[in-house]
Amino acid sequence: MREPAIVLQQLRRNVSESFCLGPLSLEIPRGAICALVGPNGAGKTSLLNILMGTGSVDAGRVSVLGHDVTQAAVEVKRRTALVSPDISYRAWGTIGRTINFVSGFYPDWDSQHCEQLLVRMGLHASERIDSLSFGGRIKLSLVLALARHAQLLLLDEPSLGLDPLARQQLFTELLAFMQDEERTIVISSHQLAELERYADYVAMLNQGQIVAHGTTPDLLSRYTELDVLLDRDGLIERSGLRLVARDGRRARVLVDRASMPPAGSGALGELQIISERNLTLEELLVALVKSNSGVRWRPRMGLS
């Protein structure tokens, strides 16, 4: 069995006085496209920075491609590439100068592949960085990452500012990158419909905690949503059930099949099931964020 690309063991990072990332424990398989999803402020960018070796760790252990990020940060950065709208290359003036500068740090830089990527992305070496659109800067960041032939590619909102055709091209390039089975991608994006199509592993973050993770098919089959009538006292205290929304006795309930008692045990009690449906990745994330497991619910919440 191959060593995982990423291993988090009780990782904790105090991002600010009011926000703590973790503790997180997670393994991301080598050769996977992992979707890192969650609402704004969940801790996704902070985690990506730690994986890149540019973010500090307050407790726990982080292994990337078999290296401890706190002890082998240089090696981690050499084998890992980050694509982010926050990276600025304006200081070098043009695309060509930027490429000349960045390529000098990487002995494995593939100049021919870089030229091919520029053509496919519609970029020219003579273009000035400050003339690029937001989407153009994302494309340049992707070119610089892919031309390195890194083993781990980290992407932070790479489809931001891209039109549908450019987003399709982005994923085409990512799939080409993944033809080498030793490579791994971790991608953070709010385009969950696209991630559901391409990602084979998902990690969901909320308020600095991992609320769900697993292969995409397993995660989507693990959860279902019920439209129910609550028992007379209107309380939910059953293992595997999370209240998503409520209006009087009627409620939407998220069911975690992995946490439910065995069939026939009467786990649903007096709940009267009106309907049941499977969830998309986006719907599952929203339901997990909105729900509150193991808490007695009394307030009314709209079902719309």
Each language-model region and where it sits:
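Short, charged/small-residue-rich alpha-helical element at the C-terminal edge
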Residues: T224-G302
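Conserved ABC transporter NBD signature motif
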Residues: G60-Q71, V76
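ABC transporter nucleotide-binding domain
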Residues: F171-A258
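ABC-family P-loop ATPase nucleotide-binding domains
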Residues: S84-L140
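Catalytic Walker B motif of ABC-type/P-loop ATPase nucleotide-binding domains
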Residues: L153-E157
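The feature captures the beta-strand-to-loop junction immediately N-terminal to the Walker
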Residues: V37-P39
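A short, flexible loop at the N-terminus of ABC-type nucleotide-binding domains that lies
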Residues: M1-P23, R30, A35, A73
